[in-house]
Regions:
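Catalytic alpha/beta core domains of metabolic enzymes, predominantly
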Residues: 1-93
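C-terminal extensions of enzymes
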Residues: 87-151
């Protein structure tokens, strides 16, 4: 399922009450909504391939919030917000190009080239992605929520 509306619909009409069904978040921008409001038990994210530690922390914070940790819920929402621009790349047709470029920027040189040489982000798109990756990395480095532990 796609965005918030689709997740909410799936939770209300399909997965709730059936122990044989599980809801997963498949859109990066909907992690908190899917887990905290729809009962999703897992996530499949593009940005998680680029920034695994922050996305795993987001998942952990959501689980803690579901167990009543109000601070974890606040931190989950902060992290979700900080990841938002990078996460929106998941919603468009160029998601693979964006995430491969971000992986390249993080030192994974094997992601520099694509199957088709003409298939690449524009210079403006590259600059936008790089600026937002740097912004997130600076934010993450100083964010106290990454150290939040369960009681």
């Amino acid at each position: 399922f796609g965005g918030a509306q689709a997740l909410s619909y799936a939770a209300e009409h399909i997965t709730s009450g059936d122990e044989q069904l599980a809801l997963l978040v498949g859109v990066d921008t909907q992690v908190c909504h899917g887990m905290l409001r729809c009962g999703a038990i897992g996530l499949i994210t593009g940005i998680g391939n680029v920034l695994p530690q922050p996305v795993l922390k987001l998942f952990e914070l959501c689980l803690m919030a579901l167990n009543g940790d109000a601070q974890a819920k606040s931190y989950a929402n902060q992290l979700d917000d900080a990841l938002m621009v990078l996460s929106t790349f998941d919603e468009g047709p160029e998601l693979v190009l964006y995430y491969k470029y971000l992986l390249f920027l993080r030192g994974e040189s094997e992601y520099e080239f694509h199957f088709n040489a003409f298939d690449e982000l524009s210079p403006s798109q590259k600059s936008f992605a790089e600026n937002h990756l740097k912004l997130f990395e600076r934010w993450w480095d100083g964010w106290e929520g990454k150290n939040h532990q369960t009681n």
